Amino acid sequence: MTEFTLSDLERIVAERAGMTDGSSYTASLVAKGQTRAAKKLGEEAVETVIAAVEGNRADVVTESADLLYHLLVVLKIADVPLNEVLAELQRRTAQTGLEEKAGRPKA
């Protein structure tokens, strides 16, 4: 089995977002707009948290998959490539968490 990456999923989301034959959940979600997609992302985040708190490993896996998928849909609608998010993670992990937090702008 070849390794499946988030970049693979990002490509699939982009392909399916443009489908017009009514067969794609992704296209349907994108057509409903960012508010709906973000709401779904939030729902999946909560479901992932619940699975983790309950210690249900299988549900953590499936809900995490849903969470990552919906995050990539939200990023697609926002026109934010996954590489930008990965670059930010790389920037943050180049220093300790406390150093990164101290460098954030004050609210």
UniProtKB/Swiss-Prot annotation:
Matching entries from SUPFAM superfamilies are given as: all-alpha NTP pyrophosphatases
Q: In which pathway does it act?
A: Amino-acid biosynthesis; L-histidine biosynthesis; L-histidine from 5-phospho-alpha-D-ribose 1-diphosphate: step 2/9
Which Gene Ontology terms of cellular component type are present?
cytoplasm
Xref: CDD domains? NTP-PPase_HisIE_like
Instruction: Output the Pfam families linked to this UniProt entry.
Output: PRA-PH
Write down the EC number.
3.6.1.31
Hydrolase as a keyword? Answer: yes
One GO molecular-function annotation for this sequence?
phosphoribosyl-ATP diphosphatase activity
One Gene Ontology term of the biological-process aspect is:
L-histidine biosynthetic process
Q: Which UniProt keywords apply?
A: Amino-acid biosynthesis, ATP-binding, Cytoplasm, Histidine biosynthesis, Hydrolase, Nucleotide-binding
Q: Which reaction does it catalyse?
A: 1-(5-phospho-beta-D-ribosyl)-ATP + H2O = 1-(5-phospho-beta-D-ribosyl)-5'-AMP + diphosphate + H(+)
Major site of localization recorded for this protein: cytoplasm
Where in or outside the cell it occurs: the entry states:
Cytoplasm
Family from the record:
Belongs to the PRA-PH family.
Record PANTHER family:
HISTIDINE BIOSYNTHESIS BIFUNCTIONAL PROTEIN, HISTIDINE BIOSYNTHESIS BIFUNCTIONAL PROTEIN HISIE
State the protein's name. Answer: Phosphoribosyl-ATP pyrophosphatase
Task: Give the source species.
Answer: Brucella anthropi (strain ATCC 49188 / DSM 6882 / CCUG 24695 / JCM 21032 / LMG 3331 / NBRC 15819 / NCTC 12168 / Alc 37)
Lineage of origin:
Bacteria, Pseudomonadati, Pseudomonadota, Alphaproteobacteria, Hyphomicrobiales
**What gene does this protein come from?**
hisE
